[in-house]
Design a protein with these regions (language model features):
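A short helix-loop-beta submotif of the ANL/AMP-binding
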Residues: 144-149
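Conserved donor sugar-nucleotide recognition element shared by glycan-biosynthetic enzymes
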Residues: 79, 110-111, 135, 160
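N-terminal small-domain helix-loop-helix segment of the aminotransferase-like
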Residues: 3-10, 17-109, 116
């Protein structure tokens, strides 16, 4: 049998030209460079945990890792106890009642949720309202999926809340989705 040594260049999808490098990816590189130069940097970047979990949490994780029933896929909607716990937390902290069976979907992260919501509700060419400043993923995923991003400003003097009067005066006829963060972003 003859061995073939051939390399194929696989070009990225054209849609990637519509986005730039993730904002926090660039910032983390800048922070790493500054640290390498011996500068004392206080990172105000992504909310990556900087403290280990409690001993009780680590012990519980270790104990559960030994459970032979704990290694399979979980239900797509998450386990009921988790969804109920989320609903109780929202009620306690925000006074918001959520139905754990129909209004809560555990995810592996916000990017997964933003992707799924955009795929489910927005067609290419439709518009999406994105807060400025806001989470960069709203813009990057919207662009990758072929939607038109319309920014709306969040201002400190307005408590970082949307100016609904300004929004009402805009042509929103093609807007399919409005991204918001609550309590708010930036936090």
């Amino acid at each position: 049998m003859q061995k073939v040594n051939q390399t194929y260049k696989i070009a990225p999808a054209d849609r990637l030209a519509s986005v730039s490098e993730y904002y926090f990816s660039k910032k983390l590189k800048e922070v790493a460079q500054m640290n390498a130069e011996g500068k004392d940097v206080i990172s105000l970047g992504i909310g990556s945990p900087d403290m280990p979990p409690s001993e009780k949490t680590i012990e519980t994780l270790c104990n559960n890792a030994h459970d032979p029933n704990g290694h399979g896929y979980q239900p797509y909607v998450g386990i009921p106890e988790l969804r109920k716990g989320f609903a109780a937390w929202y009620q306690r902290w925000y006074g918001v009642d959520l139905n754990p069976n129909t209004e809560i979907q555990p995810l592996i992260g916000s990017k997964e949720g933003i992707l799924h919501v955009t795929l489910a509700f927005v067609n290419p060419g439709e518009q999406v309202l994105v807060p400025n400043p806001g989470y960069p993923t709203y813009t990057s995923l919207s662009k990758i999926l072929g939607t038109e991003v319309i920014n709306y400003d969040l201002k400190e003097e307005d408590g970082w809340m949307p100016d609904f009067e300004t929004l009402e005066n805009m042509d929103l006829g093609r807007v399919k989705l409005m991204w918001t963060n609550y309590p708010n972003m930036p936090t």
